[in-house]
Amino acid sequence: MLSLGDTHAAQGDGEICGTAIESPMDVAIKVDLVKDAQFPFPRFETQGPVTRHFDSNGYWATTGIGEDLFQAARDAVSGMVDQVAKETGMSALEAYMLCSVCGDLRISEIVDMPNWTVSFYFPKIVLG
């Protein structure tokens, strides 16, 4: 099975508010057929780096920690939305949408179960 679609000019890892910068694209892909392969879940390979182009000005990062992974993610996102709004003068909604298109939501730690740690990284370069 092969699936391709929903191209974006930019989207943060997590697409936290369901928005990205939608755009039409022409796409060229290379497909290797692996006959009789049985994969238990989707997989892909990328040349990377995935986000290094944002690294030059550093990041703001917020963290959520708790027994519920989803709540920890919400706490990390909420903290970043508040920080971006405060630092830039944007409304909370504007900051939320900006976080969705350029920030990255990452699971930072799962070994200390039931305390999940989730971090949200906002690349400061997008603010100029």
Predicted regions, residues:
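A hydrophobic, small-residue-rich beta->alpha segment in the mid-to-C-terminal subdomain
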Residues: T46-L98
